[in-house]
């Protein structure tokens, strides 16, 4: 039996953050409490996240993950891939609050995906199918290329890198929601050019502050307009080390 890990202060923090986003977490608080307990227990064994305190986990994992719901781009019964999920963020909070989403959390580190799989089962999340692998490989596989309605990612790479990794996985008309910190004009321009190169375009740039903490965030929404050229994504590691239209040393959060 997983103990109730959310203190009254933690529950209030979760409610305030969700309220700021126009979301109702009240029916799901027990799942978030169990998720916190599981994350803390798993972190002791597996070193899953640098965030340790209840406040940091609630704000910077739970609430931060839910900000990807801004704009309504994830509202629907979408087949959705979480690119670079790590310990399951934003996939697990999204699965809790949006059970209609069909989520595939992707990470190259098996221990993290094993944790996500076990945690989803413990939380009763039947809409989560974790996958071990790299986006470069999945993006060139017949099973995954062009098969997703939505891709979501939180701050895992520079925007041009994310565009090359995410857009090949989307069907034409699909949408990629990327969450990053403050975004420079240079990175945005490179991301716009990279998106065009791999078959898409940026349709929305939404700067905002994280509820409660006030940390700066940016949601960038890209739409896939045409099939991605066969040469993209490039082989493993190349998109990160040789980003399209962007010097690797310039990469930011």
From Swiss-Prot:
Give an example GO cellular component term for this record: cytosol
**SUPFAM superfamilies registered for this protein in UniProt:** S-adenosyl-L-methionine-dependent methyltransferases (SSF53335)
Which EC class does it fall in? transferase
Question: What's the EC number here?
Answer: 2.1.1.-
Q: Which domain of life is it from?
A: Bacteria
Location in the cell: Cytoplasm
Please state the protein's primary subcellular location.
cytoplasm
Cited CDD domains: AdoMet_MTases
Residues recorded as binding S-adenosyl-L-methionine, renumbered to this chain, are: 84, 89, 135-136, 154
Give the Gene3D superfamilies listed for this entry: Vaccinia Virus protein VP39 (3.40.50.150)
GO terms of molecular function: rRNA (guanine-N7-)-methyltransferase activity
**Annotated region Disordered: where?**
228-253
Q: Which UniProt keywords apply?
A: Cytoplasm, Methyltransferase, rRNA processing, S-adenosyl-L-methionine, Transferase
Pfam families reported for this sequence? GidB (PF02527)
Q: What does this protein do?
A: Specifically methylates the N7 position of a guanine in 16S rRNA.
Alphabetical list of NCBIfam families matching this protein = rsmG_gidB (TIGR00138)
The record's similarity note reads: Belongs to the methyltransferase superfamily. RNA methyltransferase RsmG family.
Please identify the protein, giving its name as recorded.
Ribosomal RNA small subunit methyltransferase G
**Which source organism does the UniProt entry give?**
Deinococcus radiodurans (strain ATCC 13939 / DSM 20539 / JCM 16871 / CCUG 27074 / LMG 4051 / NBRC 15346 / NCIMB 9279 / VKM B-1422 / R1)
